[in-house]
């Protein structure tokens, strides 16, 4: 039985037989022209979409906040340098990733902490934040076993009322409710569907989920947030938080749907977009 020749091999044989210098030059020009045309179309479309967002009237929620993502202001994530930079730049909300060491010391870390020397102790950050009365803290909970120890620290530094939790998945809700953090505000980390948000059944499912969990709203990647979801949540008294918005185009896309919070590694960029809106 003759071996089957793949389409790719057939194409290479065709090129070998027919690729004269003149033909190759003409073919290369066509490919270049095609790619250039595609790039121009994408660029024009991107400009048009961005401009259309900027032409809309901008209204923000009364309690709208910008959270400085850990590592913002050109610092290392979950470090004292980040906390100091956030204070210096007058961030209203800062995000800290929370875990604990094997000895149960609460630390700031995105990744798993395996020794008692890893990561920076959260208490070092709280000592600085407690003296900045208008700063709130977004604690991104990476493991729920840390909740009781975290709560104890917040009580010690009188920061309960200035703190809220994110990173809480549906499977983590039971642990939150059974912890000392049960009465703290928290957003439910969830991946909503922008398309199903038009369905009454799906909309009812979202609201029931929030009612059952006790969350104050949904925290999601900005790619999954849309106007339908935002309107639904606000109509029912819930909030919408989006992450991580780091470009002007995405900032404009998100601002028009009126989230309650935007988490970003570039807070100044978000402020500039708001200040220059419509100009």
Task: Annotate each predicted stretch with a short phrase.
Residues 2-279:
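Phosphate-group recognition and catalysis centered on beta-loop-alpha active-site segments
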